[in-house]
Amino acid sequence: MPSLTTYKLLKQELDARRGEFKTVHGTVQTPAFQNVATAGAIKGGLSAQDLKDIGAQVMLCNTYHLHLRPGDKLVADMGGLHKFTRWNGPILTDSGGFQVFSLAKLRKITEEGVTFASHLDGHRIFMGPEESMQIQANLGSTIAMAFDECVENPAQHDYSKASCERTTRWLKRCKAEMARLKHEGISVNPDQLLFGINQGCTFADLRVEHMKQIADLDLDGYAIGGLAVGEPTEVMYEMISQVEPYMPKDKIRYLMGVGTPGNIIEAVYRGVDLFDCVMPSRNARHGHLNTWGGIINIKNAKYERDERPIDPACGCPACRNYSRAYIRHLFKAEEILGMRLAVMHNLWFYNHLMERIRDELDAGTFTAFHDRYVKLLDTRI
């Protein structure tokens, strides 16, 4: 059955794309950032209501973690993630694959899937394409990611090739299982979408061939996975540029796990629509805050008596109400409020960076914006 997803390309400047992505939970203006709420909340004490207040469009939750705790069946009994978290916008759930390959211990990979030990208590779990789709059906997310093998970088070409082929076979099983779950009325969200994931490590030939194969499956969207895992930034950009011509023009494109503001600007420049990253919240929890002039460490002594907001150009609750000096004090005193305000600020910055990118694309001035800010925003000041 052909995909009914409505990604609409509104405008293009070179390879950069301005678009809309319509889902059952609302329309996403793209390019867009997905805010990582691993266990259904942003680390640092932010709720779904906070995400609404900072202008977020999409929330991303973690299939692996929610399967382990509180359990996807409990979430289904509570009406799905939207009712459980009180977030009514689009939610993307990852497949669990990345966590299985990065967190879990003693894993064993077969054609059927992966057997691994929980990082919480060590109990044995099996997850394959069907199990991942069943868990995500219980979660009821707007977008489910296909279950894929995440290969460590660097990797051998032969193993990477075999892994891509297995990921394609798993993708076909994901598609079939999602169709079954919908047909039998099992999915919490009968309009759940499926995204496939391009793999191939840093081998351009594997990346391109794999993208050609999965593009033929007519999925709702396509992601580039397995990057931003230690390879040089220039290599990541090159992989995006190599794959982009083979990504369907009428489908949304998602770069997984990326990244810094500069990374995002560069990837938009290369034709990517959708992003996610733990970086803004993780950095904020350590006092590293994004501004339009670069990155500041709010714990530095030079901010002890600084009466200015974190960023005078920012409209977030932290910048509207508090000084750098006060937020620095909260960090030094180890008050939870300091972390919460910092996380709120960085996520506001990321979401409004995307809004600024969309405005520049609308105006036809994105290339000039790219040239001005791509290095500046990642500079530590």
Predicted regions located by residue number:
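C-terminal extensions of enzymes
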Residues: 1-20, 28-37, 44-45, 148-154, ...
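Non-catalytic, usually N-terminal nucleic-acid engagement modules in DNA/RNA processing proteins
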Residues: 1-188, 301-304
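Conserved, mostly hydrophobic/aromatic
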Residues: 26, 59, 94, 136, ...
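Short acidic/polar active-site loop segments enriched in Thr and Asp
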Residues: 57, 142, 220, 273, ...
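A non-catalytic, amphipathic alpha-helix used as a structural packing/dimerization or gating element
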Residues: 131, 135, 162-173, 209, ...
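Structural signal for hydrophobic packing residues in well-ordered secondary-structure cores
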Residues: 140, 171, 175-178, 182, ...
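Glycine- and acidic
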Residues: 153-156, 161, 221-227, 336-339
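Glycine-rich phosphate/ribose-binding loops and adjacent secondary-structure elements
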Residues: 165, 177, 181-183, 189-310
